[in-house]
Amino acid sequence: MKKSKLKGWLYLLPAIVFLGIFMVYPLVDVFVYAFQEGFNFASQTYKGVGWYNFSYVLRDPYFLQAVKNTFIIVIITVPVSTGLALLISLGLNSIKPLKNLFQTVYFLPYVTNTLAVGLVFMILFKKTAYTDGLVNLIINWFGSESIDFIDGPYWAKMFVMCFYTVWVVMPFKILILTSALASVNEDYYRAAKIDGTSKGRIFRRITLPMISPMIFYLVITGFIGAFKAYSDEVAIFGTDLNVAGMNTIVGYVYDMLYGDSGGYPSFASAAALILFVIVLTITVINLMVSRKNVHY
């Protein structure tokens, strides 16, 4: 081996060791646990190898509810947050003098502690013995009855959850899209204006294709992030998400390991592998679509 290649591998060695210990080994461990039936955590023994853990998880009503919640969050929050971020970024790009100021303001929710933001949302939406919450006060002004967004109907809790998720993830998307818009060559716009091209056509034919790599990057990472949702739900609804009916797949995995029904690493591993397959499948589909629609 040449000295240059050896030197390169030596530079990579710490990262390879780190990834091997904290990523590759846990993944292998999860795969092994998922197929060990009747695993006893205390004695580290199991009764056999098979598909029972997957069968149990896929028939567990708590897991099915978690899958439903996760998919609703993914389907709603990813396109809504990306679309709103694009609109705000276009607006920021058109007001040059105050662009940096507004960009900083919009980015604040992203750097704010998740639990702190969740507490604020609880104050806004939660009904208590002393107040119905700020949002319900606004609803009452319009003559409608108060809604218990935190402990009330499922649709109300899901609305708060999606609203919260969009609020938290949108600042990062605004920052990325604003940077992407700033990198578009102004010569394209000048040439289009000389030809008398309308603003709508400029957006469809120039702006959108030029920033399409960043849009698909945000969509793919948005899907992955939304499927891993858990801490946001805890911030608003507390740790017992099954009672609230707002658990997610990651929350189900955590409960199987450490919750009241915990101590079942085999079930947790099976659920984690199912989540991995779902995320991998959707990511591959997104990448295949991006090859046909992204302009590099």
Regions found by a protein language model. Give the residues of each.
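A structural signal for multi-pass alpha-helical bundles of membrane permease subunits
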Residues: 2-296
